[in-house]
Amino acid sequence: MSFKKSLKMGENLASESDLLSMISEYLKFGEFEETARTFEKEVKRKGKPALKSAGASRRDSKIISIYEDFLSSFNDGDYKVFSELWAKNIPPEIRDFDPVAQKLEFYLQIHFTIYPLKSPLGSHDKAEFDSRITHFRHYLETRGAALSQTTEFLPFYALPFVPNPMVHPSFQELFQDSWMPDLRDRMEKFLTVTLKASNTPRLLALYNDAGKGNKEAIQQMQLQLTEAERKSAVHIRRFAKLQADHHNLIGVTAELVDSLEATVRGKMISPEYLQGVCVRLFSGNMRQSAAQSLDFTRPGTASSMLRASVAPQRPKDVPLLPSLDYEKLKKDLLTGSDRLKALLLQALRWRLTRSLHGEQRDTVLQAFISNDLLERYSNKQKTVLHLIKCKNEIVRQYTARLINAFASLCDGRLYLSQIPALLPFLLDCLKTEEKESVTRENVLAALQKLSLRRAQQSAMIRDGLIGWLVKELNDSDCLSDYTLEYAISLLMNLCLRTQGKKRCAEEAKYVLKVLTELLGHENHEIRYYVNGALYSILSVPEIREEAKQMSMEEILRCYNKEENPELNRQIEFIIKQLNSATIPEQEPESDDEEDEDDDDDEEDVMEADLDKEEVLQPQPKELSGESLLTTEYLGIMTNMMKTKRRSCPPSSRSIDEPLQRPVTPSSHKNTIAGGEGVYPVTRQRSEDSRFSSRPATRTGSRPSTAESIHQTLATDSDCWRSSVESGLMGSPERHVPAPGQTTNSVQSYSGHMVGFASRPKIPRTPDSDAGSAGRSRLPPLAPQFSNSEPQQSGSRPGSAGGSSGRPSQQSSQSNRK
């Protein structure tokens, strides 16, 4: 017998005795006595492990343990533990439909409600009693509603509204010494019958449980398949239309090229020909008759319609979602069952993620904030935020998803930053959750988005998050792409701060080792953040020296031969930083500056991954989502809309240079997507442009900047020239002003700009004179370029482009252009 085969048999022997015992147990259960006796004899004859007769006894011992837990929680008045035991161990067909079980449950609810009043005189816990009264009232409105027409229970529906039940004549019986023992006896008899009723053999139980799980999984997959087919049909229709438009556009373009060639040869284009081309061009977007009735020969008509067809339109007549009773919502989030908590957290998140971008979503968010959904201003010992520490995994996950949704929006981040306990909770959760859990992914994403705010950056650095991130990234093969992207982008954000660089300098060799290994990771999306982190920390002389000892330049040269020219140019910048001989002047400490310098000025982006892989699926006829909120929690005038702070428009960006402001993956992806020639590099924005849709990506918004790197490079004129000249395709010899100078000559930027997406800091309140020109007309079709380089000043580490004072009027005006 081979070693491999014997090893396999040895592994099987460990469970063989259990399997044989289960077969014997099932034969006896089915009254196959003769077969069972023959089976046992053959087991002995073949020398198999002795059959265990502990199947029933093990089951009995488990029942006894459950029975004792019921009694213990009853005697201690622990209604939460008792409720979990009741829901888990009493079969649904008995719990929901058996009259005896329903009546017993009603009296048990009364017992747990008045339990605090039965404590020794003078030690009554009024707050605990109020909490239990709220729970009892919820029970009366839900499961207890079925007994509301029963005379026996009718008086108890007034219990929540009686100030002192102990002295009320209707409830005197409840406080007699005999009432509680009698109820316990009834409960014991019920449990004895109910728990013993399940005498199913383990083999049959395994079969039934497996079938039940498969059935539920099949139902869930069928729902997902139906939804996927619906989305697929929609996308197929859209694709067909886009394909037809594309083919039409190619044909029109070919004709226009022919016309241009004919014009060059001196042949004139007739108005009828132009009219025909324009009718074909617009036939897909309007009725044929309408297209033919327009006079496209009039100068400007066709071009105006083309610009109008791509101009973002503000949504019109978007209905606001109904107001909610937030007080009732918050109570049920604290006192309801775990399933109700999860359903409410899911519904609240969906209200935020599935609302339309613009006024509808702004109103939802402001309603959450103004009604203090996460109980920022509550003095209670336990708040909604504590659900992140709930024992139930789904509740924890859905709390993290909701916090992540808040963090995806600028005002949401502002609200979260005002909750002192939030950051410690998230950091604790990050370090205790399992690596691949969805909860940890959402907590990490929320922290990454909060790192756009300076106060949160400082707190994360103080709490040692940099060390934890580096340790996690050292084992990057065990991380999902989602976790990897957020972890490295969060690390980069923290490394932009002075204190963050100092933390990295404490373990410079280890940090550099981890970052250089990530340069070769198969996920190229993370390269931008790795390069940004390297560029930032290499500004510290101690880290530069350590990098030189590690032969960092040779390592970087190995990664400078890839097909991606943007990443290659970034590597060149890092090498220049590594070889910089100039010791930078003492940088001002940035960690204690005011929040007005937060890098949190991007448009809101609600990522699609917030609603991915929903583990909670509603049961048949169970309310969920918006229907749950509007059916059970309808309120009056709780939607308080206020003017939303406008985010600053994207400004001129050089994408060849390292990221120098805190970023999040989605906005960076939006930035580099624009570098492929799809969008102008810089452009003016109309008032309505804030309503334009943006692609849903992995995360929330992320700012980035180029000005601060220019300011850093200003100390080295060679690096300054390289930073401006590199990557501007077709214009390597254009005049570049020296640092600190400005020029009125127009710089012609040709080609596309991609790579280290970064942009200058823009004041939150732009100068009215400087901004008036940009708001006076709609965005032009052609790109508009800055008339001057940004004015250089002393770089403040981590704030990306801000100086000790505000940028000059000329600089901010050119940035907005």
UniProtKB/Swiss-Prot annotation:
It is found in: Cytoplasm, Cytoskeleton, Cilium basal body; Cell projection, Cilium; Cytoplasm, Cytoskeleton, Microtubule organizing center, Centrosome, Centriole. Pfam families: ARMC9_ARM (PF21050), ARMC9_LisH (PF21051), CTLH_Armc9 (PF23138). The keyword Cytoplasm applies. Residues 692-715, 740-750 have a biased composition (Polar residues). SUPFAM superfamilies: ARM repeat. Disruption phenotype: Embryos with CRISPR-induced armc9 null mutations show curved body shape, retinal dystrophy, coloboma, reduced cilia number in ventricles, and shortened cilia in photoreceptor outer segments. Disulfide bonds: none annotated. Residues 805-817 have a biased composition (Low complexity). Residues 586-605 have a biased composition (Acidic residues). Residues 15-47 form the LisH domain. Residues 580-605, 610-629, 642-817 are annotated as: Disordered. InterPro entries: ARM-like, ARM-type_fold, ARMC9, ARMC9_ARM_dom, ARMC9_CTLH-like_dom, ARMC9_LisH, LisH. Keywords: Cell projection, Cilium biogenesis/degradation, Cytoplasm, Cytoskeleton. PANTHER family: LISH DOMAIN-CONTAINING PROTEIN ARMC9 (PTHR14881:SF4). This is LisH domain-containing protein ARMC9.
